[in-house]
């Protein structure tokens, strides 16, 4: 199994509690900086494909709420926490590597 790291931003580029949109070869993802950690996830809410850049609200802790229908997701696991059992949010492992924030891909 191999691992690749794709740089998507620089450390310090995002203020706490903010998000940035990233284009990964045509796939739109968001990068959030919450509680000192970076989280990368799908830009679209899995419920009805709402744009989380426009409709998403970062909550205390590592949660995001889609304000279109109040679905809430855990940014660490992607689990839908409200309502329980709904389709999960796609999350990608993001980590600091030196001065860069990278998405880790395993293949």
Name the predicted role of every residue range:
Residues 1-23:
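Zn-dependent metallo-beta-lactamase
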Residues 19-107:
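Rieske [2Fe-2S] iron-sulfur-binding domain
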